[in-house]
């Protein structure tokens, strides 16, 4: 996809995300998230607002004529169109419910299995991130760049333990143990998208997570790539969990080799 096309779609995504953010602001004013009805599916939390944001974003993005795959719409997970929007209407739902940390509205554009561009709105900091490979990355209109940190011993690493992670898998657990042993600092903040944009901004140095869903990370990956970062993510499906390593080139190469 050409840079000019990416820029056009990125503006469309920004517009849709800002409409969703307006809805969040109005909804939380009328009905605080602590009293929202929610469903617990295993370790997953689903709020009313997840579904309502999904419907709003889908309506906005459908105007482009491009199909939308949403985390909150299982029927959309089998869409096979070459170009699709991939959205997580509210990444970090549990944080949102409990006011426990960051959450985000996320929209990405995919061509096949290639992430073209994405937008992440951090609802806690009220910052809008956007970007994609070859078109740069911005935070509230200001260019951002990943860090140049090359030593894991000096690195701030973002990670998480998603609900789909196999806690009996010694390889996955071993990677987390190695991070705890060698990284200078580890942060688990409950939102993959915000973790990724923090890495894109140079706040953190690298992000690593096992068994994370593509809609949780696609928009954030686009921003990291736009910010000059390296991403290793074996995306084989738009709706199956993947392992992601993203950030400074040296650290991604190091952690991907494990």
Where are these regions (language model features)?
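Conserved S/T- and glycine-rich ATP-binding loop of Class I adenylate-forming
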Residues: 92-93, 157, 224
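Glycine-rich active-site/cofactor-binding loop and its immediate structural neighborhood
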Residues: 81-125
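Acidic beta-strand-loop-alpha-helix segment within the catalytic core
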Residues: 108-195, 243-258
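Conserved beta-strand termini and adjacent loop/short-helix elements that scaffold enzyme active sites
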Residues: 71, 189-191, 234
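Conserved beta-strand segments of alpha/beta enzyme cores
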Residues: 67, 184-185, 230
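Short, Asp-centered acidic motifs that coordinate Mg2+ and/or phosphate
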Residues: 67, 117, 205-206
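N-terminal subdomain of lithium-sensitive/metallo-dependent phosphomonoesterases centered on the IMPase/IPPase/PAP
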Residues: 1-90
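Oxyanion/phosphate-interacting regions
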Residues: 1-22, 26, 174-181, 195-258
């Amino acid at each position: 996809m050409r840079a000019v096309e990416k820029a056009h779609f990125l503006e469309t995504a920004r517009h849709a995300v800002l409409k969703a953010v307006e809805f969040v602001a109005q909804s939380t004013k009328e009905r605080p998230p602590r009293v929202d009805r929610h469903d617990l599916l295993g370790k997953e939390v689903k709020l009313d607002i997840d579904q309502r944001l999904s419907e709003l974003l889908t309506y906005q993005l459908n105007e482009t004529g491009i199909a939308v795959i949403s985390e909150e719409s299982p029927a959309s997970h089998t869409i096979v169109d070459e170009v699709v929007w991939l959205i997580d209407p509210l990444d970090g739902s549990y944080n949102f419910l409990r006011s426990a940390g960051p959450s985000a509205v996320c929209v990405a554009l995919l061509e096949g299995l290639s992430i073209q561009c994405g937008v992440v709105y951090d609802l806690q900091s009220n910052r809008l991130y956007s970007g994609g490979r070859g078109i740069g990355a911005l935070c509230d209109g200001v260019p951002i760049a990943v860090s140049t940190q090359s030593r894991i011993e000096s690195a701030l690493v973002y990670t998480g333990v998603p609900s789909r992670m196999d806690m009996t898998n010694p390889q996955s657990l071993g990677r987390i143990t190695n991070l705890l042993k060698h990284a200078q600092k580890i942060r688990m903040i409950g939102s993959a998208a915000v973790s990724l944009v923090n890495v894109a901004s140079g706040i953190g140095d690298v992000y690593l997570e096992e068994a994370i869903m593509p809609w949780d990370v696609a928009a954030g990956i686009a921003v990291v790539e736009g910010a000059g970062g390296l991403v290793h993510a074996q995306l084989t499906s738009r709706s199956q969990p993947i392992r992601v390593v993203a950030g400074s080139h040296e650290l991604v190469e190091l952690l991907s080799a494990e």
